[in-house]
């Protein structure tokens, strides 16, 4: 018996959700960050024209054993979140923070090295030397949260807000950043599952 009209799209959507769930089970996660960053990536990717690639808010890189998201707000601040099977690595760079060595009177590599102290060398090497230099805070989660704060300075943890721990924060940001109103049900579905069918995504980015 052929599937009911629209059934094919539902099957594709279900398959996408199942694959995303499988990824979430494969990789270490913290506060559903993987789900929420993927939702932001899907939305930003759909709303960014190819010719405006340099204006993307978030980029995604994936290998067989790692998923990495880089959020760049265009104002000099970056949040990089890297998911592996055993840890979540979170690197923040808040350019106005006093721990920004590029703005320091004298470069102090020891400050940066201290942020990564205690992290397995293999994990540390997932970032290049240049990437590590662009750090004002570093957190890793392996079942427990680790952060080496420098003199009580959190290094700009406000950047973690881009992982949107509540739908309300995600919705407010999306509305303000993209300057448009979204269908609330579809946007909530995207936030909850990090996936929409092509038809749903097309409808979402048309706004209301």
Q: For the regions a protein language model found, what residue spans apply to each?
A:
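Alpha-helical solenoid scaffolds in large eukaryotic transport, assembly, and signaling factors
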Residues: 88-89
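Short, solvent-exposed aromatic-acidic interface loops
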Residues: 93-100
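Intrinsically disordered, low-complexity segments enriched in serine/proline and basic residues
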Residues: 2-3
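N-terminal domain-onset segments
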Residues: 6-76, 85, 100-208
């Amino acid at each position: 018996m052929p599937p009911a009209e629209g059934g094919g799209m539902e099957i594709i959507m279900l398959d996408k959700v199942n694959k995303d769930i499988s990824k979430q089970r494969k990789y270490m996660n913290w506060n559903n960050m993987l789900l929420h960053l993927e939702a932001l990536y899907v939305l930003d990717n759909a709303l960014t024209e190819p010719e405006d690639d340099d204006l993307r808010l978030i980029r995604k890189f994936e290998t067989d054993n790692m998923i990495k998201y880089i959020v760049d707000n265009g104002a000099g601040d970056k949040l990089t979140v890297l998911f592996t099977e055993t840890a979540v690595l979170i690197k923040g760079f808040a350019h106005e923070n006093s721990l920004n060595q590029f703005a320091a009177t004298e470069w102090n590599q020891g400050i940066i090295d201290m942020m990564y102290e205690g992290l397995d060398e293999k994990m540390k090497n997932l970032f290049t030397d240049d990437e590590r230099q662009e750090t004002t805070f570093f957190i890793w989660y392996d079942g427990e949260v680790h952060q080496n704060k420098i003199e009580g300075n959190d290094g700009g943890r406000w950047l973690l807000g881009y992982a949107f721990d509540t739908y309300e924060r995600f919705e407010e940001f999306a509305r303000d950043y993209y300057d448009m109103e979204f269908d609330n049900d579809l946007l909530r579905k995207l936030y909850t599952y990090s996936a929409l069918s092509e038809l749903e995504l097309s409808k979402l980015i048309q706004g209301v």
